Amino acid sequence: MKIIYESEIKKILSDLDPLSFIRDGFIAYSAGKCVVPPVGELSFKNPPGDVHIKYGYIEGDDFYVIKIASGFFKNMDIGISNGQGMMLLFRQKTGECEAILLDNAYLTDVRTAIAGAICAKEFSN
């Protein structure tokens, strides 16, 4: 099992075409090939914050992913980012953990930006 930190994730992404991966994921989802259960959520009052747990897989793929993303809105008061997160990558056939991606919500930001670009392109046609 590998632990991959945000700085390494950024280097790896610079050599890939994440737009095509996200687009292919949308196509697989629209074709009914994705298993995406409802989002799990933990809410906190003091300090105010929440944690979302998302998970899923594409049928026939090699992996499934569990994403844990949190937002604690007073973190900036203590000098840390409001958003935290990681993704856990497992093999579909064995359940073995292949990698922990300590991305600090970076991959979520990239995915959101790319999804917006794809939608803008498709709706402008």
PLM region spans:
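N-terminal ligand-binding/catalytic initiation module
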Residues: 1-108, 115-117
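Short internal alpha-helix immediately C-terminal to a glycine-rich phosphate-binding loop
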Residues: 111-125
